[in-house]
Amino acid sequence: MNIIKKGFLMNEEIREKEVRVIAEDGEQLGVIPTSEALKRAEEKELDLVMIAPTGKPPVCKIMNYGKFIYEQTKKDKEAKKKQKVINVKEIRLSATIEEHDIGIKANNARKFLKAEDKVKVTVRFRGREMEHSNVVGNKILKTFLSKVEDVCVVEKPARLEGKNMTMVLAPRK
C-alpha cells in the first residue's frame, strides 16, 4: 500500500506480543496475541492499526487504514475551516489630519470591521506636536470613533505609547 503515514503503527510494524483488539464494528475482541490479531485482519482484508500505543497492553483496531486516514484528513480540514483567523489592520493618522480625511480613513476602518478584522488606529506625533499630544490625539481618536462606533466596540482605549497614541477597535458581534 502506498499510503501516507500519520504516526500510527500498522500490521507487521507492531512489535508487541499481545494487544487489545477492537473489531471494525467497534466490538471488543479482548487481549489477544499480535499474530492472531494480524490473521483476523488479513482474513477480512483490512489492516491492524495501533491507535493507543501507551495503553497496557496497546490498543489496536482492525480497519481500512486508507479510509481511516482519509476520514482523519477530512476532519482536520473541517476543523481548519471553522477556525477564523483574526487580523489586526492598522490605520495611521497624523496630528494635523483634516475632518474629511478622517472620514475617508473611517470608511476604510468600517470595511475592515465588517470583514471581522480588528483595527488599530494610530495617531503619530512629530517634533513639537508632542507638546499637546494628549489633547490633540484624544480629539482625533474621538472624532474617528464617532464615525465608526455603530460597527465596533473599543477593545483597548486611547493610550499614549512613545510618539504614538493608539486605540484598538473590534467588530461588534
UniProtKB/Swiss-Prot annotation:
Primary residence: cytoplasm
Gene Ontology CC: one annotated term: cytosol
Signal peptide: none
InterPro entries: T_IF-3_C_sf, T_IF-3_N_sf, Translation_initiation_fac3_CS, Translation_initiation_fac_3, Translation_initiation_fac_3_C, Translation_initiation_fac_3_N
Keyword Cytoplasm: yes
Localization in the cell: Cytoplasm
Record flagged with keyword Acyltransferase: no
Pfam family, one: IF3_C
Alphabetized UniProt keyword annotations: Cytoplasm, Initiation factor, Protein biosynthesis
Gene Ontology MF terms: ribosome binding; translation initiation factor activity
GO BP: ribosome disassembly
Family to which this protein belongs: Belongs to the IF-3 family.
Protein task: IF-3 binds to the 30S ribosomal subunit and shifts the equilibrium between 70S ribosomes and their 50S and 30S subunits in favor of the free subunits, thus enhancing the availability of 30S subunits on which protein synthesis initiation begins.
Subunit structure, as described in the record: Monomer.
Entry protein name: Translation initiation factor IF-3
Naturally occurring in which organism (per UniProt): Clostridium tetani (strain Massachusetts / E88)
Phylogenetic placement of the source organism: Bacteria, Bacillati, Bacillota, Clostridia, Eubacteriales
Gene responsible for this protein: infC
